[in-house]
Amino acid sequence: MSKKPPNRPGITFEIGARLEALDYLQKWYPSRIEKIDYEEGKMLVHFERWSHRYDEWIYWDSNRLRPLERPSLRKEGLKDEEDLFDFKAGEEVLARWTDCRYYPAKIEAINKEGTFTVQFYDGVIRCLKRMHIKAMPEDAKGQVKSQHPLSWCCPIDPAGSCNQSMGSEDWIALVKAAAAAAAKNKTGSKPRTSANSNKEKERDGGKWFKVPSKKAETSTCIVTAEIEKKEELPTSSEPFGLHIDSVPKIVFPQPESTLTNKRKNNQGNSFQAKRARLNKITGLLASKAVGVDGAEKKEDCSATAPVLEQAISPKPQSQKKNEAVISSSANTQKPALLSSTLSSGKARSKKCKHESGESSGCIKAPKSPLAPELIQAKDLTLVSQLSSVINKTSSPQPVNPPRPCKHSERRRRSQRLATLPMPDDSLEKLSSSSSATDGKVFSISSQNQQESSVPEVPAIAYVPLQKLGPCLPLDLSCGSEVTGSQAPDSSYPGGECPREEKEETPLFANPTSKVVSDVKGAAAATGILKTEKKVKLEEKTSTAFGKRKEKDKERKEKRDKDHYKPKQKKKKKKKKKSKQHDYSDYEDSSLDFLERCSSPLTRSSGSSLAPRSTFTEKTTTYQYPRAILSVDLSGENLSDVEFLDDSSTESLLLSGDEYNQDFDSTNFEESQDEDDALNEIVRCICELDEENGFMIQCEECLCWQHSVCMGLLEDSIPEQYICYICRDPPGQRWNAKYRYDKEWLNNGRMYGLSFVKENYSHLNAKKIVSTHHLLADVYGITEVLHGLQLKIGILKNKHHPDLRLWAYSGKRKDQDQVVAGAERKVILQDTANSEGRKYVQNHKEPPLKMEETYITSEHSYQKPQSFSQDCHSLTDPGSSDDDDVSSFEEDGELHVADNSHLLYSVKERGVSEKNPASENKVFVYNDKKGMEGPGDAHLQWQLNLLTHIENVQNEVTSRMDLIEKEVDVLESWLDFTGELEPPDPLARLPQLKRHIKQLLLDMGKVQQIATLCSV
């Protein structure tokens, strides 16, 4: 087959090029070329978003390959007529927003790449492709008189007054005309049902009053309600922001009336069902209606009232004229009922809008006196009907309740925690401080606007005043005295407000921006560690929003009474643990971990590991538990929603005298310790994260288990308890379970059966430790002998590349290093670790310690090891295998070298320096290189190596003598116990094997018995 790829349009035969490939199931998938075989003429094709095991070799001329982007004739045939238009700069069009709906816009500029810069009716400028722009109907063009950037609300003239009637009516006319033109274009379509009755109108700008949260991707709480409303509106409803003077003079344009007649004929009998659905969402429309009016800041300070009744209950044309009069008469007939409902709905809709990131304003129509002839008797009945509908629908569970976003919830909690708690009587005074104003409609100012809406939506998130600033009404005639009982009257049929919502009001006495700016950074500004930790804890847990102080007190009493003693006992045990064991050979991270556990203060300061403590989910609990900060919730479930919600600043702190009986420490330490107690984790084999009965705590991960589930009683807890996960961590090697059995190596203690009174390992701990030291010394000798074999191999081979590392003998250092014995351990461990792997990488030998270090440590083998140092390694109870091996390496045959130069280490320059020999290096043998011949140099190198081998052999002999003495000590202990002198070990070897095999069988049976009994 040819080595040149074929010419296939749309396919680039390069590695990484994208195309479409047909898999064996005859489905086309986007794919990528991984490899190309020019010999065979095929390619390795990777199907995107599939595993690489599905990669397939396909011939490059196969019909299973096709271009990724191919022209679609079907799509081209379905192009609309409006695609033929060529738009110009400054032309009015319908542009598509991110919610896939079209809104009135104006073309600002036409870019080179075929995109259009458009400015939407609300001032937002975006760059759109041609496909997202539609021509505006001719009868809708040129009707906009005001092009203020905030045209969705009332346009503001230079004098600052609100040209509301002009801007609103113009946009209404534009939208109505666009809807009518769209309806004319669809003459041949089938009759519309109630579900899609207004769909084209929505696309062609039906959302002219859209809440500007579209810039934050259209918050769901408002958009959902508006979509429902728009799909079910028989006509375009009257605007929310109409000037009140224009209400009696409403003239409906001719296109709307003809459209209404068409719709009535098409819809048929679907009106009644639609009417019932409209009644359900009336409450939401009432609250949403005020969400779109906004930016009225410099309004006259007379008493104001939003006229929203036209939009509350959308009705057919016959009822619309009546409601135009209702809207004007509502102020005098039912002021308290309607206005309280609407104002509380306004606060709620403002919160919904601001949760999606909005900071733009809201408009409010000024109240003007109404002519008395507009008030009619049948209008009054409609007003009462409307108010009853609002009463029903504005219950605490609306159809589409606005969901609070998490960010605002956190801000609200930080406000509560940062503010000093106020007494209950001040709360009541705050909520019911002023008398009810029945004769006039009030407007809610600043923070009190939020307070009145709290009973409506208990789960709403509070928004700081800085964000609410642009949309706060400036009618301060009522001051801060706002009736707190009117909103509950309209929302709760019984006329009473649940008290848990009343206590949830934010405790701000002064609603100024200065206070809010302090509150916004409350967690950082206070500088109190406990407040920050509580906020973090509350953020992690999904909490309900009710707050009952009686329950809080009962919870505290129950916590103090029932679950304090087991925690006390375990805390004492934790302190004792860190004193009685030697953890010198643990890892560094483990040392930090143990320091955390040793005292209350250091435990809390080490809580930077707390992000790992998210073990409330069952599926993610089984992780390696090294860095878990677990604490005791004192009888409370971590997932208990109300406990965390009740945790205000004072309720989470236990008083200092409760801990004086346990710790002799300061109050600060007690509070820190109790603060850790909030993070404790229950991780038991039963997978229940609640505390019942007696609890035991793992000494490694500090997680708590039920003693009943673990098969342990209160009087049978072992000295060292390690949980089942730490002993057998999932995802680790099987030998990781012995990580916590270092008691056996350090102290010679092993777990025994609980019913055996005398544990053999406890009685013979010293002998076991001595045996361990003996084995460690034997292991170290084995490593040294292996290193000697390697060196002898280098000595025999004259051309070995590593022979030049012995270019300089270390004999001259005898005079310099008489003092060096003491500091040797400090300096050389890092050196051996940092440069010790070079030889292993070159020669691929087994990674034993001596072969790593026989080339890479210093020429200090000339000074023989003193007997006292060897005895010290024997008698030190805390030393382990690593100590013995490293002590021999350091004293036996240490020298530092590089593959290219012989380097003196830092010890040659000064013994007490602690950094490795990477900075102060002295080049020695380069000076001699020119004077000596190559044959003499090799001979000298071999001589130096031979001397080194002899010294190491002397050290091995010395160490063997010490091992023999260790064996003598163990045998003397055997004689001291009265046992007979053991016979020749070789003769006992078969018997020993049988005994070990029998012991393994017995241990297997014991393990099976223990497994069955624990269940």
UniProtKB/Swiss-Prot annotation:
<feature type="modified residue" description="N6-acetyllysine">
    <location>
        <position position="907"/>
    </location>
</feature>
<protein>
    <recommendedName>
        <fullName>PHD finger protein 20-like protein 1</fullName>
    </recommendedName>
</protein>
<dbReference type="InterPro" id="IPR002999">
    <property type="entry name" value="Tudor"/>
</dbReference>
<keyword id="KW-0479">Metal-binding</keyword>
<feature type="compositionally biased region" description="Polar residues">
    <location>
        <begin position="443"/>
        <end position="453"/>
    </location>
</feature>
<feature type="domain" description="Tudor 2">
    <location>
        <begin position="85"/>
        <end position="141"/>
    </location>
</feature>
<dbReference type="GO" id="GO:0044545">
    <property type="term" value="C:NSL complex"/>
</dbReference>
<feature type="domain" description="Tudor 1">
    <location>
        <begin position="11"/>
        <end position="71"/>
    </location>
</feature>
<feature type="cross-link" description="Glycyl lysine isopeptide (Lys-Gly) (interchain with G-Cter in SUMO2)">
    <location>
        <position position="79"/>
    </location>
</feature>
<keyword id="KW-0862">Zinc</keyword>
<dbReference type="GO" id="GO:0006357">
    <property type="term" value="P:regulation of transcription by RNA polymerase II"/>
</dbReference>
<dbReference type="InterPro" id="IPR013083">
    <property type="entry name" value="Znf_RING/FYVE/PHD"/>
</dbReference>
<feature type="modified residue" description="Phosphoserine">
    <location>
        <position position="432"/>
    </location>
</feature>
<feature type="zinc finger region" description="PHD-type">
    <location>
        <begin position="681"/>
        <end position="729"/>
    </location>
</feature>
<feature type="region of interest" description="Disordered">
    <location>
        <begin position="183"/>
        <end position="206"/>
    </location>
</feature>
<keyword id="KW-0539">Nucleus</keyword>
<feature type="cross-link" description="Glycyl lysine isopeptide (Lys-Gly) (interchain with G-Cter in SUMO2)">
    <location>
        <position position="530"/>
    </location>
</feature>
<dbReference type="GO" id="GO:0140034">
    <property type="term" value="F:methylation-dependent protein binding"/>
</dbReference>
<feature type="region of interest" description="Disordered">
    <location>
        <begin position="859"/>
        <end position="889"/>
    </location>
</feature>
<dbReference type="InterPro" id="IPR043449">
    <property type="entry name" value="PHF20-like"/>
</dbReference>
<feature type="region of interest" description="Disordered">
    <location>
        <begin position="389"/>
        <end position="455"/>
    </location>
</feature>
<keyword id="KW-1017">Isopeptide bond</keyword>
<feature type="compositionally biased region" description="Basic residues">
    <location>
        <begin position="404"/>
        <end position="415"/>
    </location>
</feature>
<keyword id="KW-0677">Repeat</keyword>
<feature type="compositionally biased region" description="Basic residues">
    <location>
        <begin position="566"/>
        <end position="579"/>
    </location>
</feature>
<feature type="cross-link" description="Glycyl lysine isopeptide (Lys-Gly) (interchain with G-Cter in SUMO2)">
    <location>
        <position position="849"/>
    </location>
</feature>
<feature type="region of interest" description="Disordered">
    <location>
        <begin position="309"/>
        <end position="367"/>
    </location>
</feature>
<keyword id="KW-0863">Zinc-finger</keyword>
<dbReference type="InterPro" id="IPR014002">
    <property type="entry name" value="Agenet_dom_plant"/>
</dbReference>
<feature type="compositionally biased region" description="Polar residues">
    <location>
        <begin position="186"/>
        <end position="197"/>
    </location>
</feature>
<feature type="cross-link" description="Glycyl lysine isopeptide (Lys-Gly) (interchain with G-Cter in SUMO2)">
    <location>
        <position position="75"/>
    </location>
</feature>
<dbReference type="InterPro" id="IPR019786">
    <property type="entry name" value="Zinc_finger_PHD-type_CS"/>
</dbReference>
<keyword id="KW-0007">Acetylation</keyword>
<feature type="compositionally biased region" description="Basic and acidic residues">
    <location>
        <begin position="539"/>
        <end position="565"/>
    </location>
</feature>
<dbReference type="GO" id="GO:0008270">
    <property type="term" value="F:zinc ion binding"/>
</dbReference>
<keyword id="KW-0597">Phosphoprotein</keyword>
<keyword id="KW-0832">Ubl conjugation</keyword>
<feature type="compositionally biased region" description="Polar residues">
    <location>
        <begin position="859"/>
        <end position="878"/>
    </location>
</feature>
<dbReference type="InterPro" id="IPR040477">
    <property type="entry name" value="KDM4-like_Tudor"/>
</dbReference>
<comment type="function">
    <text>Is a negative regulator of proteasomal degradation of a set of methylated proteins, including DNMT1 and SOX2. Involved in the maintainance of embryonic stem cells pluripotency, through the regulation of SOX2 levels.</text>
</comment>
<dbReference type="GO" id="GO:0042177">
    <property type="term" value="P:negative regulation of protein catabolic process"/>
</dbReference>
<feature type="compositionally biased region" description="Polar residues">
    <location>
        <begin position="315"/>
        <end position="346"/>
    </location>
</feature>
